[in-house]
A protein has these predicted regions:
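Glycine-rich phosphate/pyrophosphate-binding loop and the adjoining helix
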Residues: 2-10, 150-224
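N-terminal beta-loop-helix "entrance" segment that forms/cooperates
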Residues: 50-67, 163-166
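N-terminal beta1-alpha1 ligand-phosphate binding loop
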Residues: 5-41
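A generic structural motif
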Residues: 41-46, 148
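Helix-loop-strand module that forms the ligand-binding subsite of alpha/beta enzymes
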Residues: 67-146
């Protein structure tokens, strides 16, 4: 049979990193687990370190005099080289870490905007009973403002010192939920990669399916 010229779809490329500088942080462990599961589900994973994206405090005078720092340029390259991203972020005082917000502020200065149109999944691991959920809600705000399609189902792992004792989630139910959440995110990002129409019509809902009066759909561009 003659070669039809068709080739398998290229693998989904996913950037994964923890918004923590400590190598042994709970969120680094959760990010590493997410990277492993993503690879097991067929993705090509770019596991990065927050230390790769070191930047000074945002300063407009510094930007005007020296340009955007290398750490922010590094995150931009990683975002542009991948189809989607996963961030595992700790919660500091009911919000996201300051170093992550500062990095996002620097990256927001790029045009075209590297966060725009990319799918993102937010995770958190915390020793508290809340699991870092408040920090993830705070993190959604700047990412969505910059055009990220943040996956509706975030994952917060409470009492993570016990739950991640061996680098994996020991509780079977939680482990299954974590893996299912990742698989659903990867499926959506994969569909967006191979079917461009999905990028132009994005429906987001939390908990219940959208209704005609409550859903949010980005307008589809049409040529006249």
């Amino acid at each position: 049979m003659a070669d039809s010229g068709r080739h398998p779809n290229p693998k989904l490329k996913v950037l994964v990193f923890a918004a923590s500088l400590r190598a042994e942080s709970l969120n680094h462990k959760l990010a590493t687990l997410a990277a492993r599961i993503a690879e097991e589900n067929g993705a090509t994973v770019d596991l990065a370190s927050m230390r790769d994206f070191d930047v000074p405090s945002y300063d407009g005078d510094l930007e005007a005099g020296q340009g955007i720092p290398a750490g922010a340029q590094g995150l931009r390259r990683h975002l542009m080289d991948n189809d989607a991203f996963i961030i595992s972020s700790p919660e500091y005082n009911g919000s996201m870490p300051g170093l992550l917000k500062n990095l996002i502020d620097w990256v927001s200065r790029f045009r075209p905007q590297p966060f725009d149109g990319r799918h993102g999944l937010l995770l958190s691991a915390s020793p508290s009973l809340a699991g870092g959920n408040r920090g993830l809600w705070a993190l959604r705000v700047p990412l969505e403002h910059l055009g990220t399609r943040v996956f509706p189902d975030m994952f917060s792992l409470a009492m993570a010192e016990k739950a991640l004792a061996d680098g994996d989630i020991g509780d079977t139910t939680l482990r299954r939920r974590f893996e299912k959440n990742l698989q659903s995110f990867l499926s959506l990002a994969e569909a967006a990669k191979h079917y461009p129409c999905i990028k132009r019509a994005w429906v987001e809902f939390l908990g219940e399916p959208p209704t005609s009066g409550a859903d949010r759909v980005d307008p589809v561009e049409t040529s006249i």
